[in-house]
Regions:
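Active-site beta-loop-alpha junctions enriched in small/polar residues
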Residues: 24, 73-75, 130-132, 161, ...
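Metal-dependent amide/peptide-bond hydrolase catalytic core
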Residues: 208-383
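Divalent metal-coordination and catalytic microenvironments
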Residues: 19, 57, 70, 100, ...
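Acidic/His- and Gly-rich active-site-bordering loop/insert found
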Residues: 2-96, 101, 105, 109-120
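Histidine/acidic-residue-rich, glycine-tolerant segments that coordinate divalent metal ions
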Residues: 77-79, 84-95, 101-102, 117-245, ...
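Non-cysteine beta-strand/loop elements that form the S-adenosyl-L-methionine
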Residues: 69-71, 80, 183-185, 339-347
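General structural feature for long, well-ordered alpha-helical segments within catalytic domains
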Residues: 8-15, 28-39, 66, 94, ...
Length: 383
């Protein structure tokens, strides 16, 4: 069992406090990056910048031909935090509602423990920006020359999970998180008076037909054995009750696990939308932005991690998870090299963490110790 010195846990809480109180939005995390650099300087860990604010720390090992990477993201979300939390964001309208402050504090704590160790391989500490918005900061890390010349044989990340109790970890070998693409459909027509629909194209009606028709993609075109989600969450037009608008915009998301079906479905979305719009007198403009791919936990590495962590924490503290339809840009690493994405329990009976991406989210900080022990055990038990 790995014991974390009390003074190191104090430092990890200090890191968390600073990061939580000073959240920054994706691709604009200047203060956060500066803070991480100061800590790495204090620990005498060399680093290089990657992208606008990403950082790759590096600890040389005895065998310099091998590298293992640990990754934490550090961007925040445009959400106003609930005011009764023990710590509060100092930036109105911005908060760490997805646990990225916790991820970074855990990785900094792990770096502090391992900085003085002689490891049999190089250890890379990836502090990544811009996870929350496309195209995601992982692209900047992967495209970095230093990363390419020290390509890891294994990359590991943790993510806060409010549905798991503190002290418990979850892993799903194989496909874990769905791919996700952004859909934007804009319909144009002549517009007109609501009392004279015969003299215009009713874009609201047309858009409604499109939303309903596209659901056949999930109910009739997708295999019943292949999880697929197509949801439109934004229906916008600037109009009023007695006006047929000239423009209507739909925005939604498409998610699945199979790359061939992913591409086929996007073709169907374009074809169905165009056919309905044009047959009803509208001109469609369709934009589908490729999002993150499917996150894949390489089974052999996932099983290795499960074995190590059960030894560290006990059989009942490491559970196997099912697939989920949310997305994560750690998936980009998983498409390139063996990867393991681990869920870190952050709730307790006395401290319900709230849901991710909500103003109520605030983790039980006892998870800091679990997270640091998790990463350290995976590194120190890997020859």
């Amino acid at each position: 069992m790995i014991n974390i010195p009390p003074e190191l846990l104090t430092n990890a809480r200090m890191h968390y406090t600073y990061l939580h109180e000073h959240p920054e939005l994706s691709f604009a995390e200047e203060q956060t990056a500066a803070y991480i650099r100061r800590i790495l300087d204090r620990l005498q860990i060399q680093y290089t910048d990657a992208g606008p604010t990403g950082i790759i720390g590096f600890l040389p090992g005895r065998d310099t031909s091998r590298t293992i990477a640990l990754r934490a993201d550090f961007d925040a979300l445009p959400i106003s935090e609930k005011e009764d939390h023990p710590l509060i964001s100092r930036k109105p309208g911005i908060m760490h509602a997805c646990g990225h402050d916790l991820h970074t504090a855990v990785l900094l704590g792990t770096a502090e423990i391992l900085a003085t160790r002689s490891l049999p391989f190089n250890l890379m500490f990836i502090f990544q920006h811009g996870e929350e918005v496309l195209p995601g900061g992982a692209r900047d890390i992967i495209g970095n020359v230093f990363f390419q010349t020290h390509l890891p044989e294994w990359i590991i990340a943790l993510h806060a999970e409010p549905d798991l109790p503190v002290g418990q970890l979850g892993i799903c070998p194989g496909q874990y998180m769905a791919s996700g693409d952004e859909i934007s459909i804009t319909l144009h027509g002549p517009g007109g008076h609501a009392a004279l629909p015969d003299q215009s194209a009713d874009l609201i009606l047309i858009a409604s037909h499109i939303v309903v028709a596209l659901q056949q993609i999930t109910s009739r075109n997708a295999s019943p054995f292949l999880p697929t989600v197509l949801t439109f969450g934004h229906f916008r037009c600037h109009s009023m009750m007695n006006i047929i608008p000239k423009e209507v915009r739909l925005e939604g998301t498409f998610r699945t696990f199979d790359e061939t079906w992913r591409q086929e479905a996007k073709t169907r979305i374009r074809r169905i939308t165009t056919a309905i719009a044009e047959s009803m007198g509208a001109q469609p403009a369709i934009e589908i932005t490729d999002g993150y791919p499917c996150l894949y936990n390489q089974p052999e590495k996932a099983e290795q991690a499960i074995g190590i962590l059960k030894t560290e924490f006990g059989e009942k503290q490491v559970i196997r998870l099912g697939r989920r339809m949310t997305t994560e840009d750690f998936a980009r690493y998983s498409q390139l090299l063996p990867a393991t994405f681990i869920r870190l329990g952050v709730s307790s009976t006395t401290h319900p963490a709230g849901k991710l991406h909500t103003p109520e989210f605030f983790p039980d900080l006892a998870a800091l110790e679990t997270g640091i022990r998790t990463l350290c055990s995976l590194i120190l038990n890997n020859d």
